[in-house]
Regions:
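Short acidic, Gly/Ser-rich segments with clustered Asp/Glu that frequently serve as metal-coordination loops
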Residues: 10-23
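Flexible, glycine- and charge-enriched loops at secondary-structure boundaries
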Residues: 24-26, 74
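Metal-dependent phosphoesterase signature
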Residues: 64-88
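Metal-dependent phosphoesterase core characteristic of DEDDh/y 3'-5' exonuclease domains
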Residues: 2-4, 26-69, 90-230
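Extended, low-complexity cationic-aromatic segments
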Residues: 7
Length: 230
């Protein structure tokens, strides 16, 4: 049976600290969730786009400057995080593969909220494809500090590379970024460069899926920054 997919993007209340577990004190909260459901041929089935009502947390000024979200707007238009988590978990439980631009970030945001809610974080169930990592060797953008290798491209850089015009109006909303990730995923699939899904590895999880093979037959680590708490 062919895989079905769900494109995931999140906006958060502040910047994430990847050196800490997803649900550690001080980690940012989910503020905006976007999901785009795809069939096995990457055709859109439906989408899901919701703001999250704060339950005591606030928006960091830096995050607000990027995503335009405010506590007032989220309080007025948001839904309880529990409702959003039910939608997300249903997608994973039904076997969909998560596709995201920086899947390590978005799945960790979701994992933190699931843990706070006392739910299964679905670490082992969340098969995912990170199109940001897949585009790193495609874009080949050098580091500016002289470091060897290529840096992870920004979403706009990856879109420009494949000939897609980055959206300026509404940029950095979860749905706009999810649509960008979808465009990149389709390009990778068309060019037979879409990685096979894998489970992200994190520190203290050495027994999990060791590699995320590419369609070309080459294997790469499931994440370049695996030595981090889950």
């Amino acid at each position: 049976m062919s895989d079905r997919y769900v494109v995931l993007d999140t906006e958060t209340s502040a910047l994430f600290d990847f050196s800490k577990p997803a649900d550690a004190e001080g980690q940012p909260r989910l503020a905006h969730l976007a999901l785009i459901y795809l069939d096995s041929e990457f055709n859109v089935e439906r989408d899901y786009d919701v703001l999250i009502k704060p339950d005591g947390w606030t928006i960091d000024a830096g995050a607000a400057a990027v995503n335009g979200l405010t506590v007032e707007r989220l309080t007025a238009d948001g839904i309880p995080v529990a409702e959003a988590l039910l939608e997300y978990t249903k997608a994973i439980e039904t076997g969909r593969v998560v596709v995201a631009f920086n899947a390590q970030f978005d799945t960790k945001v979701a994992r933190g909220e699931l843990r706070r809610a006392g739910m299964d974080d679905m670490f082992m169930k969340t098969r995912n494809i990170c199109v940001m990592r897949a585009m790193t060797d495609v874009c080949q953008i050098p580091y500016t500090n002289g470091r060897a290798g290529f840096k992870f491209p920004k979403l706009a850089e990856a879109m420009a590379h494949i000939g897609e015009m980055p959206v300026t109006e509404g940029a950095h909303t979860a749905m706009v970024d999810a649509l960008g990730a979808l465009a990149i995923a389709r390009w990778l699939r068309t060019n037979q460069m879409l990685p096979e899904p894998g489970v992200h590895l994190a520190k203290k999880r050495p027994d999990l899926v060791p590699t995320q093979p590419r369609r070309s037959g080459k294997a790469k680590p499931a994440a370049a920054t695996d030595e981090l708490p889950a």
